[in-house]
Amino acid sequence: MELKAFIEITRPHNCILAGIVGLLGSIVALGHFPDPKTALLIFLVVTVGCAGGNTINDYFDYEIDKINRPERPLPRGAMGRKVALYYSMLLFAVGLALAYMINIYAFILGVIAYVTMFIYAWKLKPLPFVGNIVVAGLTGATPLYGAVAVEHLGLAGYLAICAFLVNVAREVIKDIEDVEGDMAKGAKTLPIIWGKKRAAYVGVLFALLTVIASFLPVKASVGVGYYAMVPVDLLILYAAYLILRNQDREVAHKSQKLLKMSIFLAVMAFLIAAIV
């Protein structure tokens, strides 16, 4: 067993990014920074929950990761599967204890999100499109969690919609990237059932819906600061163009990475709109 595997299996960069998005969601909702204690708790609840979700996901994905992600801790033998299971439960417990310290609404949403993560990894992930929707919903809930924690919605509701839509696109394109390993496991993802080209159409559709939804805050009389979203929309459209043109593994990887980047950039754009 490698001690570094306890950090590596959580995919810390993703978790820290999720924590930042949760915190930024609270700022977008309020229009200013929350009190330091609440800000720290929001960041920790989202970060630790994401770590637990990634760990339990690797526990259930052991066989498929032997093909798609052999470098990860479980396939390469750096951590035992049972250890990973217990570790994920510990992370979830710590996250919920921290959520309880915020308010009852943050605790309830935390319970819903954590349970959903477990059920997704256990049963929902192989289901065509259902798994994509669940992951996208969890991503959309990340900035929304920050808003719930400060008991104010503001622009965070619009941000959650955009985060959900762009993540549906990203998850479908990720399935195109991982189609070889998914077929070996017997998973029934959208690209396997419909073919990569049709799946690409679905991904592109949700990318376009994201761009359309990104203009919803204009209805709320948001100031000129919201124009920061325009470059993000262009990035989303470029990612959609790439996967529409070519569904090879390398292209799908690049497209979904660009969409992942767009999520964080969208949060920053909404942040600018909220405080300007």
UniProtKB/Swiss-Prot annotation:
It is a multi-pass membrane protein. InterPro entries: DGGGP_synth, Prenyltransferase_related, UbiA_prenyltransferase, UbiA_sf. It catalyses: sn-3-O-(geranylgeranyl)glycerol 1-phosphate + (2E,6E,10E)-geranylgeranyl diphosphate = 2,3-bis-O-(geranylgeranyl)-sn-glycerol 1-phosphate + diphosphate. One of its GO terms (cellular component) is plasma membrane. It is an enzyme of class 2 (transferase). It comes from the Archaea. One of its GO terms (biological process) is glycerophospholipid biosynthetic process. One of its GO terms (molecular function) is geranylgeranylglycerol-phosphate geranylgeranyltransferase activity. It is found in: Cell membrane. Pathway: Membrane lipid metabolism; glycerophospholipid metabolism. Its cofactor is Mg(2+). It holds the Pfam family UbiA. Its EC number is 2.5.1.42. Keywords: Cell membrane, Lipid biosynthesis, Lipid metabolism, Magnesium, Membrane, Phospholipid biosynthesis, Phospholipid metabolism, Transferase, Transmembrane, Transmembrane helix. Its main location: membrane. The chain crosses the membrane at residues 14-34, 40-60, 92-112, 146-166, 202-222, 224-244, 256-276. Prenyltransferase that catalyzes the transfer of the geranylgeranyl moiety of geranylgeranyl diphosphate (GGPP) to the C2 hydroxyl of (S)-3-O-geranylgeranylglyceryl phosphate (GGGP). This reaction is the second ether-bond-formation step in the biosynthesis of archaeal membrane lipids. HAMAP family: DGGGP_synth. Belongs to the UbiA prenyltransferase family. DGGGP synthase subfamily. This is Digeranylgeranylglyceryl phosphate synthase.
